[in-house]
Structure formats: C-alpha cells, structure tokens
C-alpha cells in the first residue's frame, strides 16, 4: 500500500500534464503529495520521512513553477532530489558505521557489511547518473519527452536496478548458507 501511495503522485502528474499543461500538473502534484501525507497519517499514525520530504520538495518547486510560470523549477526538482539521495548514500558510505541502504533493509536481509557497502555505493552512483540524465533530457529534449522520461524512463531504470540489486543480494545470501 505504501509503495502505491509513493508512486501515485508521479502518475497523477503525468495524467494532468497530458490533459492540461505542466503548470496544472505541478499544482496537482502538490495537492496529491499533500493528500498522501494525510493518508499516511490516517492509516499509519505517522508520516514517513520520504513522503514528507517528497511533499516539501514538490510544494517548494511546484509553487515556484506555478508562481513564476516557469517549468524549469519542476524540472530541477528531481535533479536536486537525486543529488541529495546520492550524497546521503555517499556520506553514509564513508562516515557512518552502516551504509544507509543497510539501515533500511538489514531487518529483512542478512548479508555481510562489505556487500551492503557495494550496494550502497552503486545506488549512490545510480542517483548521480539519474540527476545528470535528468538535466540532459530537460535541456536537450522537449518538455513532453522530459515528462514521459521522468515517469516511465526513471521508473524503468529504478526497477531495473532493484532487479539487479535483488539478484546480487540473492547470490550473496546463497553463498552465506
């Protein structure tokens, strides 16, 4: 349920963009992200950090997009978020006892710390790659291509890395048995 709630805003944004424009889509993104925080609160008695961070970034960049009537703000949102994710993972890689990915998944997955560090580093590089790719697509392609890639391209890339990570983890779990 949480995963569906977390990806719903992206598809609402896409639908509103297709029927209206980037500015109405940005407004819809702000509204649906706020509603998701409320739904999280009602269902789970808490708002998880990712949903709150997502709402605050959508509110900030979406509001700037609408207020200045400039789509560059919403285009930069995803780049900045990816850079933040990359930096958080990278900082946890070198300056904390456990990498961030391990903190999220170690309750369910038991593998050596060295493998967690490799996975964490790969995901940090992935987010940096996505940030650069987003800038490239936003500036060298049409807005429609950017929206389509934002929704379907980044989702596909993320699912692909999740699949590769799962296979890698499964191999390491099998070796530990």
UniProtKB/Swiss-Prot annotation:
The chain crosses the membrane at residues 22-42, 50-70, 76-96, 121-141, 149-169. Its main location: membrane. One of its GO terms (cellular component) is plasma membrane. This is Inner membrane-spanning protein YciB. Belongs to the YciB family. Plays a role in cell envelope biogenesis, maintenance of cell envelope integrity and membrane homeostasis. It comes from the Bacteria. It is found in: Cell inner membrane. NCBIfam families: ispZ, PRK00259.1-2. Keywords: Cell inner membrane, Cell membrane, Membrane, Transmembrane, Transmembrane helix. It is a multi-pass membrane protein. It holds the Pfam family IspA. It comes from Buchnera aphidicola subsp. Acyrthosiphon pisum (strain 5A).
